[in-house]
Amino acid sequence: MKGTCSPTSTSSGRSSTPAPPPAFDFQPLGRVVFGSGSLARLGEVARELGGTRVLLVTDPGLEAAGHPQRAVAAIEEAGLEAFVFDGVKENPTEREVAAGVVFARTHRVDLIAAVGGGSSMDCAKGVNFLLTNGGRMADYKGHGKATKPMLPSVGVPTTSGTGSEAQSYALITDERSHLKMACGDKQAAFRVSILDPEVTLSQPKLVSAVTGIDAVAHAVESFVCARRNPLSQTYSHAAFRQLEPNFERVMSHPTDLAARSAMLLGAHFAGMAIEAAMLGVCHSCANPLTAHYGVTHGVAVGVMLPHVVRFNAAAVGDLYADLAGSAGALADRVTAMLSAAGLPRTLKECGVSESILPLLAEEANQQWTARFNPREVSEADILGLYRAAW
C-alpha cells in the first residue's frame, strides 16, 4: 500500500529520501465485538459497563425485523431493565434528541444503547450530550465541548454504512438551516460496538445500496484527505478491500452472510478511518443536496464521488491508483457500483434543478469537510463538480 511517506521522484527519475510520516494523535475509542449472533451479548456488555437501566434508542422501522425486541430480550436476560425510545427519524434534528432526553430523564437511565443505522447512532449520542451536559446541540458543535461526564454507551449498527459506531461525533440536523451540525467529544463515543452481520440480513436492497455506497465513499475520501496518516490509511485501505468486492455480491445475493460480514466490517473500518483522519469535498457537496431535495445521503455521495475523484487526481492520483489502478479506474468503478445497485448516477436523475447549483455550491463551500480535501477547493470548483455531476 502506498502511503503518505512514499519515496518522491527527482527530475532525474531517481527516488529521493522518503518524506517522514505526518504526525498524528489517535486514541482508539473502544472495544469491538464482531461475529454472527453477537447482538445476544448486548445485555452482558451493558452489565459489564455498570448499566442497570438501559435506554435503547432505535427507529420504529426496525420492529418488523425484530431487532429491538431481541435487544430488549438480551438486556433483560442480563438482569437489567430496558426502556425503548423509538422516536428516531432519518437525519435526526434537535427535536428528536430533545424528545429522547425527556424520555431518558423520565426513566432515570444510566446507560445508552443504540440499535439501528446512523440516525439511531447520532440521536443516541445527541441524547447523551444533552442529558448529561444540558444546553442545546449547537453548544457542542465542533469537538470537546462537554464539561461533565457522559453516560457509557453501546452501539449496534443494523446497516453497513455510516460507521457511526466507530466515531465520536453526532451529526444532528439544524432545523433552521437544514445543515448538519457535527458535535464531537471522546466521551460521546460508544464504549463498545457490537457488530452482528446477521442483523444486516434484513436490510432492504435500497438500504443496503445507499449505506454501502456511503461506506465506500468514507473509505475513499478518508484515504486521501488532507489529514490522512499511516494509521488512518491502514483502516481506509482495509475498508475498501472489504467493501469493493462485496458490494455487488450483496446486491445480487442479499442472504450471503460472508458478503454481509465483509460489508459490516468494512463500514466499521471506514468509520475508524474517519475518526483518525477526516473526509473531503464529496461529503460537503452531499449535505446541501439532502437539505434542499431530500436526496438520500448515500445517493448524494455516490453521484458526487466519481467527479471528486477525477478532480483530486492531480493531487493524489497515486493514492487512488493504490485502490483501483488509477483515478479514472476508481471513478469508473464507483459508477459501475451505482449502476449495479440501480441508483441514480446524475443530479438530474435525482430531481435537482440546474438553476440551484450556484446556491448548492455556496452552501457546500461552508461545510467543514471541504477544508480537508486533498486538493484545495473553492466555491467555483465546487460549482464545477456539481455541473459535472448534473
What are these regions (language model features)?
Residues A40-L55, A73-A78, T106:
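Glycine-rich phosphate/diphosphate-binding loops that line cofactor/substrate pockets in enzymes
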Residues E354-W390:
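Short, amphipathic C-terminal "tail helix"
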Residues Y235-C285:
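Oxyanion-binding "anion nests"
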Residues L289-I356:
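Gly/Pro-rich interdomain helix-loop hinge
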Residues E63-G135, R249-R260:
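N-terminal small/polar loop signature for handling phosphorylated ligands or for N-terminal nucleophile
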Residues M1-L49:
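N-terminal amphipathic/basic leader segments beginning at the initiator methionine
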Residues A40, T132-R228, A315, L319-D322:
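A glycine/threonine-rich phosphate-anchoring loop and its flanking beta-alpha core
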